[in-house]
Amino acid sequence: MIEYLKGAIVGLTPTNLVIECAGVGYDVNVSLTTYSAYQGKKEGLIWITQLIREDAHLLYGFSTKEERTLFGQLTSVSGVGPTTAQLILSSYAPQELAALITTGQADALKAVKGIGLKTAQRIIVDLKGKIQLETSSDEILSARTAVGDAALNTIASGEEAISALKMLGFADPAIRKAVKSILSEDSSLAVEDIIKRALRML
């Protein structure tokens, strides 16, 4: 099994990363969290989970071991496949997700597209005792009021963009994560520009 890949990053989208190692290019599935970590980088090391099926060999990549561990824990839950696990990790940063599971916030997990209440509750029941937080819940909640949140609260275009993206069928947590990131870089963007950029990330 592949533990990690290290080499030149030759392609990067919100869902996939192509990394060249010893002349071979590997197509790796990634979350928005990992995508953000490798933006602008020409080289990198990515931690790998390899899934072998009859019809395909799939690689899932993560910028940290912590995110990879969460991916493995999520896919161990009945009803949560790798695609759904990646969507959950795209909606919440690892520490945020760990806090939601530890504190039993099923409604927040249910907001992720494809996750129903029963599945959200199952994730909490199965993983609550396995999640180890390196920071307290208070620190995590405090972090969620940083620059991105301030931008959403003060700029009307951010809320308009969120509403429009919801109408397109995207999940609220993933939308807010994308829009916060966009506005933290440029808070003067018009609604249509925010939406266009968010669509490239969702």
Swiss-Prot record:
Q: Where is it chiefly localized?
A: cytoplasm
**SUPFAM superfamilies on file:** DNA helicase RuvA subunit, C-terminal domain, Nucleic acid-binding proteins, RuvA domain 2-like
Taxonomy of origin reads: Bacteria, Pseudomonadati, Bacteroidota, Bacteroidia, Bacteroidales
The answer to whether the entry has keyword Hydrolase is: no
Regarding protein family, the annotation reads: Belongs to the RuvA family.
Q: NCBIfam families from the entry?
A: ruvA
Q: What does this protein do?
A: The RuvA-RuvB-RuvC complex processes Holliday junction (HJ) DNA during genetic recombination and DNA repair, while the RuvA-RuvB complex plays an important role in the rescue of blocked DNA replication forks via replication fork reversal (RFR). RuvA specifically binds to HJ cruciform DNA, conferring on it an open structure. The RuvB hexamer acts as an ATP-dependent pump, pulling dsDNA into and through the RuvAB complex. HJ branch migration allows RuvC to scan DNA until it finds its consensus sequence, where it cleaves and resolves the cruciform DNA.
Q: What is this protein called?
A: Holliday junction branch migration complex subunit RuvA
Q: Where is this region: Flexible linker?
A: 143-153
Molecular-function GO terms, alphabetical: ATP binding; four-way junction DNA binding; four-way junction helicase activity
Where does the record place the region Domain III? Answer: 153-202
Organism annotation: Porphyromonas gingivalis (strain ATCC BAA-308 / W83)
Gene name in the database record: ruvA
Arranged from A to Z, the UniProt key words for this protein are: Cytoplasm, DNA damage, DNA recombination, DNA repair, DNA-binding
Q: Where in the cell is it found?
A: Cytoplasm
Instruction: Pull one GO CC term from this UniProt entry.
Output: Holliday junction helicase complex
Do the record's keywords include DNA repair?
yes
Quaternary structure and partners: Homotetramer. Forms an RuvA(8)-RuvB(12)-Holliday junction (HJ) complex. HJ DNA is sandwiched between 2 RuvA tetramers; dsDNA enters through RuvA and exits via RuvB. An RuvB hexamer assembles on each DNA strand where it exits the tetramer. Each RuvB hexamer is contacted by two RuvA subunits (via domain III) on 2 adjacent RuvB subunits; this complex drives branch migration. In the full resolvosome a probable DNA-RuvA(4)-RuvB(12)-RuvC(2) complex forms which resolves the HJ.
One GO term (biological process): DNA recombination
The free-text domain remark for this protein reads: Has three domains with a flexible linker between the domains II and III and assumes an 'L' shape. Domain III is highly mobile and contacts RuvB.
Q: Where is this region: Domain II?
A: 64-142
Q: Domain I: where is this region?
A: 1-63
